[in-house]
Amino acid sequence: MKFIDEFRDAGLARGIAQAIAREVQPGRPYRFMEFCGGHTHAIARYGLTDLLPANVRMVHGPGCPVCVLPIGRVDQAIALALDAGVVLCSYGDCLRVPASAGGSLRKAKAQGADVRMVYSSRDALTLAQQHPDRQVVFLAIGFETTTPATAVVIQQAAALGLKNFSVLCCHVLTPPAMVGILDAPAPGAVAIDGLVGPAHVSVVIGSRPYEAVAERYRK
């Protein structure tokens, strides 16, 4: 099948590995950070580290926006659901993110909060239309890939005149996250030679947002 078999071509993979081996300097260590949790999963699943030269190391990065969601944001969402009595909705993986004191949105639901799982931002907007007597809050999360969908429902809610729909915005921008990693604890102190950026995000934002990062931290 087109574009499937090519990704599973052992000969092609070995050729790429050999090309990498020819490029690296034997006496120098290399550290590359994959930014996305999907990359980390693929590297582990397919044993890609075994194909790389011994002096090339992959460093696991921040992962997905859900993985790095600050505890304070989860606490805020739980407080809205438990104390303010709103309909708090978000994607399924957000409901399991741990908050302070061992809490989570899923546990808040078990305590009586109206927490609902949705598959899209549009589902959250539909809930607001179906329950005009309730305040519906959508916990929005994701990289630049999901931000447009959140923006669209905000525009749609305004066009419909909905007063009971709001968004708790927890979207994350990729380039600032990269800068945060590379600047900790001080600019240039992190032993990383390159970053493997998230593919879906890069399709959305293009290469220009990365240019400043590449120029500033180039070795």
PLM regions and their residue ranges:
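Phosphate/pyrophosphate-binding betaalpha-module
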Residues: L139, F143-P209
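Metallocofactor- and cofactor-centric catalytic cores in central/energy metabolism, strongly enriched
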Residues: M1-D133, T147, A158-L160, S166-L168, ...
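Conserved anion/nucleotide-ligand pocket segment
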Residues: V213-K219
